[in-house]
């Protein structure tokens, strides 16, 4: 496990890159998310599939605020252009996800902070191990 970049998350999220597929523009990782941690605002440029292995994940504010809450064990799908202002983990959580295409982390005015492709994920992983 290595730390996920703090510029793109809060609360000590860790990750492991499991696979990259340059021919598909895809990358797969598993994430360890402590209680109270979150990912910064982002847009799924391409679709993604995940499986929660432990805990809970609140997307778009969670069910109580009109969003979704994923509970382990459980499968989820993110369509193209899905926007998440904040993805929050109210308890210790872990999930496996495949991203088909880039993940666009955005700032407060919608500007791109980081566009994470399979190559960027691979470079970040290799630099951290």
Tell what function each PLM region has.
Residues 23-25, 35-37, 56, 82, ...:
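Short, charged/polar surface micro-motifs in flexible loops or helix N-caps
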Residues 1-25, 67, 111-129:
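A short, N-terminal "cap"/entry segment at the start of jelly-roll beta-barrel domains
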